[in-house]
Design a protein with these regions (language model features):
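Nucleotide-activated chemistry modules centered on ATP-dependent adenylation/adenylyltransferase
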Residues: 1-7, 12-430
Length: 430
């Protein structure tokens, strides 16, 4: 082993891991940190990495790529895992893995290393992504190595190691939960949350949340947001206070037209996160089925993603053909499972994405949503490609006479044939 690229955050765990790998393999270590919107302080990270033992440190700004190439295609597919989870952590891992693999190939490294534990899903996501992108790279997972776990059975041993080896980390008191943040969401798990009866909405847990206010603390007046979609992808939005948010996040509009602000996918997510967060939207508490076989409780904040999901569904409702929608809906659990289980880079996900792209070619229009104390309510939808015909749908007299109610008699009779046959068979068996 001559060179290893290590996924690095600058925290205690990855700093110790970096130093330990250098000592174990006696080779060059390159640190890699991906910025996927985790809002961590990255200044000084290169110095910290080289002081710890890395020959160099790369920081990849993947925020726009993450939104454009991962979040938006996934929401275009309507993916949601087990009916609740918007896959915030799951979708970030292939993006990070791709960035790390690209650095490894550029640096002619022999291996990549990550700090994911042997009990979680992330180890699978990182390694399956690497297998598809660069099958010749060796993947090192220290937490699955007996000697690493023996040396570091707990946090105290890591702190002692850092002090002994002059690793520049500031060890803080461990929080009663673990947290993972990116542009799409924040996840909380472990610690106090391992008790499935623990109330994550209780006042004692109030300080845990970072992206959203508690619904009961949200404004007493509803807030409206309009979103424009083109081919199933959100391109623009309109809401009170948008300009202030653009200034706050240093975002430059691509265009401003008819009151709508056109933004890049990254900009869309930043603004929607702020809008949803201040209205208490996007909190989920669930017990999910991990790919590695166990059940795990997670608490998630996905304010912007929740708005995007709801709006996309509304514009689909008037623009998608019924059978195309039902076909796509039947594939959502499979698509979501592929993302959750680490198969973003796979031929089957590519095939599903092609179907999604075809299904979305007329999903273009405007949606109006009402945000109020944690609720996201549809308040209108319209499209030049709408399949909704008010003249046909009306309960009043149809001026077009394109729907003859008498035709329903034959339709019902034909659909009842198999039911009557089943009933006759059941009666004969008595």
């Amino acid at each position: 082993m001559k060179k290893i690229v290590v996924a690095y955050s600058g925290g205690l765990d990855t700093s110790v891991l970096l130093s330990w790998l250098k000592n174990k393999y006696q080779c060059e270590i390159v640190a890699y940190c991906a910025d996927v919107g985790q809002e961590e302080e990255l200044d000084g990270l290169e110095v910290k990495a080289t002081t710890t033992g890395a020959s160099k440190c790369f920081i990849g700004d993947l925020r726009e790529e993450f939104a454009r190439d991962y979040i938006f295609p996934m929401f275009q597919a309507g993916a949601i895992y087990e009916g609740q989870y918007f896959l915030g952590t799951s979708i970030a891992r292939p993006c990070i893995a791709k960035g790390m693999v690209e650095i490894a190939l550029r640096e002619n490294a022999d291996a990549v290393a990550h700090g994911a534990t042997g009990k979680g899903n992330d180890q699978v996501r990182f390694e399956l992504s690497a297998a598809m992108l660069a099958p010749k790279l060796v993947v090192i997972a220290p937490w699955r190595m007996d000697d690493f776990r023996a040396e570091f059975p707990g946090r105290a041993e890591m702190i002692a190691y850092a002090e002994k080896h002059n690793i520049p980390v500031q060890a803080s008191a461990k929080k009663p939960y673990s947290m993972d943040r990116n542009l799409l969401h924040i996840s909380f798990e472990a610690g106090m949350l391992e008790d499935t009866w623990f109330d994550a909405t209780a006042p004692s847990a109030r300080d845990m949340y970072k992206l959203s206010v508690a619904p009961e603390d949200a404004p007493d007046q509803p807030e409206y947001v309009h979103l424009l979609f083109e081919n199933g992808l959100c391109t623009a939005l309109k809401a009170d206070g948008t300009d202030a948010l653009l200034d706050q996040f240093s975002l430059k509009p691509l265009a401003v037209k008819d009151g709508f602000t056109y933004l890049s996918p990254y900009g869309i997510m930043k603004v929607l996160n702020a809008l949803g967060g201040r209205n208490g939207c996007g909190r989920v508490d669930m017990v999910e089925n991990r790919f590695v076989g166990m059940k795990s409780r997670g608490v998630y904040e996905t304010p912007g993603g929740s708005i995007l999901f709801a709006a996309h569904r509304q514009v689909e409702s008037i623009t998608m053909d019924r059978e195309v929608m039902h076909l796509r809906d039947s594939l959502i659990p499979k698509y979501a499972a592929l993302v959750y289980n680490g198969f973003w880079f796979s031929p089957e996900r590519d095939a599903l994405q092609a179907l999604v792209t075809e299904s979305q070619k007329h999903v273009t229009g405007e949606v109006r949503l009402k945000l109020y104390k944690g609720n996201i309510m549809a308040a209108g939808r319209r499209s030049a490609f709408s399949l909704y015909d008010e003249a046909i749908a009306t309960m009043e007299k149809d001026p077009t006479q394109s729907y003859n109610q008498n035709d329903a008699t034959g339709f019902i009779s034909l659909n009842a044939l198999r039911l009557k046959a089943s009933a006759r068979r059941a009666s004969a068996a008595l």
